[in-house]
């Protein structure tokens, strides 16, 4: 289990962020607009949206995936909050985590029609929330790529988010498919 270090989680506010700065796990202060903070914030937003997906989900197999992903997103956030030279290597995204996402992708793709067109994000609430989560995941991935141009990061972070966004797309299609909702093709 990851330790929060200096963080006092008993207080709901400190007032230290009132002037546009925040602290990361190491205690280092930085601008809230810093690339690292943007990346951490996008991952946090994604985790919250996956929680929203869980609130609309009635399928145990999907909930198991969502919960594992939520736990892993905390790992992603922990990696981003530590500069790579200061990070414990036992708390990191690994190739096995990506393989697990790929396994779920393959399993859920088997029950879906082959796509030949773009489809509109729509359908039941779960599907709509999953599509929104997918776009947040893509943003988080872009923020992590930007940070990786500034410093060395675990390359599995980018791979994990890339695969996760694909899985969220497939699960959005799965949610509609299970409810018998037809996909709407994009028309130009």
Predicted feature residues:
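Phosphate/pyrophosphate-binding loop motifs in nucleotide- or prenyl diphosphate-using proteins
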Residues: 1-188
């Amino acid at each position: 289990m990851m330790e929060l270090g200096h963080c006092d989680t008993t207080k709901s506010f400190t007032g230290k962020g009132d002037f546009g700065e925040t602290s990361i796990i190491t205690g280092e202060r930085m601008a809230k607009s810093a690339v690292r903070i943007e990346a951490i914030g996008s991952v946090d937003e994604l985790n919250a949206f996956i929680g929203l997906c869980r609130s609309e989900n009635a399928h145990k197999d999907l909930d198991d995936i969502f919960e594992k992903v939520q736990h892993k997103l905390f790992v992603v956030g922990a990696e981003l909050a530590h500069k790579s030279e200061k990070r414990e290597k036992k708390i990191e995204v690994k190739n096995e985590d990506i393989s697990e996402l790929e396994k779920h992708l393959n399993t859920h793709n088997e029950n879906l029609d082959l796509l030949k067109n773009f489809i509109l994000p729509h359908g039941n609430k779960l599907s709509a929330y999953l599509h929104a989560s997918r776009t947040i995941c893509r943003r988080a991935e872009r923020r992590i790529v930007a940070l990786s141009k500034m410093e060395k990061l675990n390359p599995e972070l980018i791979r994990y988010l890339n695969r996760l966004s694909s899985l969220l797309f497939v699960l959005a299609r799965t949610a509609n498919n299970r409810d018998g909702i037809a996909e709407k093709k994009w028309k130009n």
